[in-house]
Amino acid sequence: MKLKGRKIVGGKAEGEVIVSRKPLSFLGGVDPETGIVTDAESDIRGQSIAGKILVFPRGKGSTVGSYVIYALKKNNKAPKAIIVGEAETIVATGAIISDIPMVDGVDVSKLKTGMKVRVDADSGEVEILEDGE
């Protein structure tokens, strides 16, 4: 199955999905040294986003969150790609300065943790390769 969205940052990535059903704040919500989600309100608290395809409805929080995404990339703890239901400037800026493929406008309810997907951000497409859990 292919899901259609909109390119925010071009590029391609393939890998395992980790899904948060709640908005995600990077500042204070993700440890830039480890890639572990630390936000007490997050449904993926304690899990690593490093090397995964990160899926969530939208970002929240401070503009400094963009630099947390950049620090994740510099520390080799960033996600391979970001898929959001609705892009906002904090996450989009972080993905742009970190060169992380990003797509928005995707029906994130169709994705679940453990799936394997291919993201073609250039065309705005997300292809589900394996169903996961």
From Swiss-Prot:
Q: List the catalysed reactions.
A: (R)-5-phosphomevalonate = (2E)-3-methyl-5-phosphooxypent-2-enoate + H2O
Recorded GO terms, molecular function? hydro-lyase activity
UniProt-listed InterPro entries: PMDh-S-like, PMDh-S-like_dom, PMDh_S
Q: Which class of enzymes does this protein belong to?
A: lyase
Q: In which pathway does it act?
A: Isoprenoid biosynthesis; isopentenyl diphosphate biosynthesis via mevalonate pathway
Establish whether keyword NADP is in the entry: no
Q: Which residues form the active site?
A: S62 (proton acceptor)
| The enzyme's E.C. designation | 4.2.1.182
GO BP terms: namely:
isopentenyl diphosphate biosynthetic process, mevalonate pathway
Record keywords: Isoprene biosynthesis, Lyase
The organism's place on the tree of life at top rank: Archaea
Q: What PANTHER family does UniProt report for this protein, alphabetically?
A: DUF521 DOMAIN PROTEIN (AFU_ORTHOLOGUE AFUA_6G00490)
Assembly and partners?
Heterodimer composed of a large subunit (PMDh-L) and a small subunit (PMDh-S).
Q: Which family does it belong to?
A: Belongs to the AcnX type II small subunit family.
Task of the protein: Component of a hydro-lyase that catalyzes the dehydration of mevalonate 5-phosphate (MVA5P) to form trans-anhydromevalonate 5-phosphate (tAHMP). Involved in the archaeal mevalonate (MVA) pathway, which provides fundamental precursors for isoprenoid biosynthesis, such as isopentenyl diphosphate (IPP) and dimethylallyl diphosphate (DMAPP).
**Name of the protein this chain belongs to:** Phosphomevalonate dehydratase small subunit
Q: Which organism is it from?
A: Thermococcus kodakarensis (strain ATCC BAA-918 / JCM 12380 / KOD1)
